[in-house]
Design a protein with these regions (language model features):
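Internal maturation/activation junctions in enzymes
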Residues: 89-111, 137-167
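Polar, glycine-rich mid-to-C-terminal structural blocks
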Residues: 1-19, 27
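Function-dense linear segments that define catalytic or interfacial modules
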Residues: 16-114, 124-134
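Active-site-proximal structural scaffolding
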Residues: 5-8, 17, 64-69, 89-92, ...
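Short amphipathic alpha-helical segments with coiled-coil-like heptad repeat character
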Residues: 1-2, 135-139
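Short basic-aromatic helix/loop recognition motifs at nucleic-acid
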Residues: 116-118
């Protein structure tokens, strides 16, 4: 059966709006711009972490890989300055990396993925409160640039911490 692309996109958007269940991932974009050497086939539900997969043939398959989410959130409202953001980002990266080594995994394929790939997902919380503290609303024209600057700093310090740990 063929479905017109616009109709399908409309149905997906409607379902997402009404249920919150559909997350759209652009696999081609992820493969073109991601850091993986292996092809990315999927992501976790919320799309923080892209996952190359090696399919499971059995629940005890020691050669397979399935993605797991190693996640944390940075509370932007509590960050006082760039020095504190750098410190908190460093702590988050080291904490999540330590978690990879110390947690119990439900199947060997999950442990394989986590320990081989070491994917970390770091989100943010309290964006609305930070905007309010700065006298901004989501729809203010200055809000996107403000959020972009904060996200760039967050990303920079997380990557810096990861690079330092890799050394």
């Amino acid at each position: 059966k063929k479905v017109p692309a616009r109709e399908l996109t409309g149905l997906l958007a409607k379902e997402r709006l009404e249920t919150g269940r559909i997350y759209t991932m652009f696999v081609d974009h992820a493969n073109e711009h991601g850091s993986w050497l292996d092809q990315v086939d999927t992501s976790n539900l919320c799309l923080e972490v892209n996952h190359p997969l090696i399919p499971i043939n059995d629940v005890n398959d020691k050669d397979a890989e399935i993605g797991v989410c190693i996640l944390a959130a940075l509370n932007w409202l509590e960050i006082k300055d760039d020095e504190e953001m750098e410190s908190v980002c460093d702590i988050i990266v080291r904490m999540l990396d330590a978690l990879i080594e110390h947690q119990d995994y439900f199947v060997p394929a999950a442990e394989n993925f986590a320990k081989k790939r070491r994917s970390l997902g770091v989100g943010v919380s309290n964006l609305a409160a930070l905007l309010a503290k700065e006298g901004l609303k989501y729809w203010d024209t200055k809000a996107p640039n403000f959020v972009s600057r904060w996200m760039e700093k967050t990303s920079y310090y997380l990557i810096k911490a990861s690079v330092e740990m890799a050394k």
